[in-house]
């Protein structure tokens, strides 16, 4: 993920931000509402204004199923926390910051296989249900969707519900010649960068820079 952070930092500087305002290593703590502070992965502070805050998350290995819900809860909670802190004036009288979420998932067979949902009482959201199987004694059964699809839905809904300004979902093989794919056309790195650049241009324009 370090390479992606460097790439995004370079893009921000090319868009007109000062290099010293873009932070990726130290002093990344921002105030919250439900907790005192949270350490973000990349933030931009310019002339006292919070321009943007970003999360870079990744998932690799065989035990991916144990972490999907944790990642989802973390993403939603962090966004709710910082937006409430913004509402309460923790970041001064400035326009809303850009909140970005980038997720990189290891591309392997077990993340592309449908995973059944446990539904002892109620049916899950149809988007997580997947394709319908043959009808059984309890009616239509569904295969469920893969872990990669679950992460795709997470990223899409984080933006749909306005928890994050923009999100990006990437998959990459763990090999000598890494192959990167972008499963969802609405969650590509190009679209993410375009939204990021647009926010920076608007911010600098409001400052007359």
Regions found by a protein language model. Give the residues of each.
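Short helix/strand-bridging catalytic loops that position acidic/His residues to coordinate divalent metals
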Residues: 29, 57-70
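Glycine-rich, often proline-containing surface loops adjacent to acidic residues and nearby aromatics
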Residues: 49-61, 100
